[in-house]
């Protein structure tokens, strides 16, 4: 079997390392941070394994003016940043047609159809019983108008067998009585579940990997080097040789890809969360709020309100206005929320078509990419790891990943 390096110890990299190690490969995982403590740490905790609708919608054009100038909406844009990154923005908008939205939904559906099964394989080896909650998410709409504006997304989900049920105000109140009844109706995403600690999920998979002879080196990788058909990782003043290398470094992946001649239109959607004290067990299900694009999820450490999108790159500091909007809106929906325990911002890796990059480099044989999962990193981590394992072993994946290939741009 091969000597493999996996760069990136978020949920994608850890799941990939798990499958490769389990199949007999000698695997070393690299990250400059502790496993699971970066982007994977801060998500809303949903296993949205059947989600196929992304931000690339033909209806975005109609709503764009309002979205762009609404500082209390689900999308906030730093105009200076966007103007300096116009090629990415133009590519994104080109993917906001009916034909492209259909293609993206079909591609995600084909890839995610075995996401749950891939996680089951991991969870057969890793005890996460206390971290998985089988309560279906509820997504709430403030008004009939807002609900009707989302019919296109509902129809697309129906086409690709995403199961959901529309429930009325009275039904919502029975399920989650602590919610202020300021909603019009809601949608229950059937068959989905969530984790009460994304960090613990990643750490438990990582600990199992280490327990079974996996290796972890906490260090920043500077570059990938190819010499005489051999592959090396360069860090500090050292080089380490490997047979195969997997780049699963999230939004930082392109920095490594460039060192071997690849270049991807990878950018970031900055996401935020606030954790509130949950003294009275206010929620039993994840509850989404369509108007602001966040979920309120009951977790071990409190109620985490996570989501929103800010287009502002990697360098700008945390936007306190985003946090203020999240807190104000969350308290309006759930008035009994306790004190703020913590605030967080992370960087979702995003490509213009909202699809991940999964496949082998053409510039450098035996280098594989697994990044760009934007809002679905937790949901698609296990199936991504499974597919990368199959690609490395030259096995049939039984999943059509043509739309995810690294050279589609």
Please provide the spans of the model-predicted regions.
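Glycine-rich FAD pyrophosphate-binding loop
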Residues: 22-41
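A conserved short coil-to-beta-strand element within the FAD-binding core of flavoproteins
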Residues: 167-171, 175, 217-231
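Rossmann-like flavin
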Residues: 86-204
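Flavin (FAD/FMN) cofactor-binding core of flavoprotein oxidoreductases
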Residues: 140-144, 158, 170-175, 268-269, ...
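Active-site substrate-recognition segment that forms the wall
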Residues: 45-47, 51, 55-95, 223-226, ...
